[in-house]
Amino acid sequence: VITTATDLNQKWAVDIFAKKNRLYIEDMKLAKLVSADILAGKQVLAEIEPECSVIGQIPKELKFIHESDRCDSRALKIHIGICKNDAPAGSGTQVLYLIPKAVVLGIGCKKGTAAEKIEKHVTQVLEEYGIFPEAVKLAASIDLKKEEPGLCTYCEKYDIPFQTFSKEELEQAEGTFTGSEFVKQTTGVDNVCERSAMCAGGEKILVHKTAHEGVTVAVAVEKWSVDFE
């Protein structure tokens, strides 16, 4: 109701903006508080992660700040991006996260690895680096793993599209990768997870190869943008 009111009053509406840009709203209660502040004539603080391209003019209802800026102790803040950036403890600042699907997971695993082990390691990596699971757009690996039961089960559970590439395609990936002679002997390419993430649309690697219990994971981010027009 409140977000509809912002639209009817020709003010910037967070839910419409999120829908247009395919952003996940992490907390609808905070979204309503943002809309209430805007209806009351207040400017809402907002920040966007540097990887994002901004299209159009920033609406007057928002005041953009840098992540390092100090906020009013009672302020609401919008954070647009894939990573958690909580306000300092005790600051009183509440953060509404708007999350794009811009993360690509590169995954490698030993044959027969259980889905639970894959899920456990992916979850640990995302949590360690503060990356929202809702930001994951797809997972990628080498074509040798196209029908790997554990990988397929994990992706199906979280409704994550799964894409695979031949070793020749992986070899063409541009960038600096964490090579392994053992992996090259096994798969024909020196690195599966990082190269897969880049081949699947990654613009840059956020998390290089991490390995645990036979599972390797890398995280890349695509180019992404938000449109205020």
PLM regions and their residue ranges:
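Cofactor- and metal-binding active-site motifs of prokaryotic enzymes
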Residues: 1, 8-19, 25-37, 59, ...
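Conserved mixed alpha/beta catalytic, RNA-binding, or beta-rich assembly cores of soluble enzyme
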Residues: 1-24, 37-146, 150, 220-222
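A generic local secondary-structure boundary/capping motif
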Residues: 29-37, 68-70, 92-96, 195-196, ...
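C-terminal non-catalytic interaction/assembly regions of soluble proteins
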Residues: 117-124, 134-197, 201-217, 224-229
